[in-house]
């Protein structure tokens, strides 16, 4: 790989790290808001989402920045896109603490006593969750694949 490509991968990996760190920070701050919402159970879900997905993104970035791998620039682009797509999903969950939608997260909504949101709110929840979910699966799959390639090149699955 050229120096420019490596720099691009490194820069994008740092951006992924920043997304993860900020997701955790927003999640921690959001925790103070949880008891003051109409649906605190849904607000708690948003808090957990911000923090847990933020940690996953931090882990992804740390792996990219600190371990040898075969992740190319396009794959890192997918990973960065996934990090960006987490924001609308997590923010929609935070908004859902007021909306009370039921279609995307029916178990949590049932526990929260939510009765359903406006049609556009239900659509926002669905679109943001599906987009982020698919992007995260693709990003993590590319990450695993790149590390498996490295292990296979070394002649063992243990790298």
Predicted features and spans:
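Calycin-type beta-barrel ligand-binding domains and close structural analogs
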Residues: 99-102, 106-109, 125-132
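N-proximal short alpha-helices
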Residues: 2, 6, 15, 22-24, ...
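Membrane-interface interhelical loops and short amphipathic "cap" helices
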Residues: 32-48, 104-120
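Individual transmembrane alpha-helices with interfacial aromatic-anchor signatures
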Residues: 115-136
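Juxtamembrane membrane-water interface segments of multi-pass membrane proteins
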Residues: 1-15, 33-42, 59-80, 95-105, ...
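Hydrophobic cores of alpha-helical transmembrane segments in multi-pass integral membrane proteins
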Residues: 16-33, 44-64, 80-96, 130-145
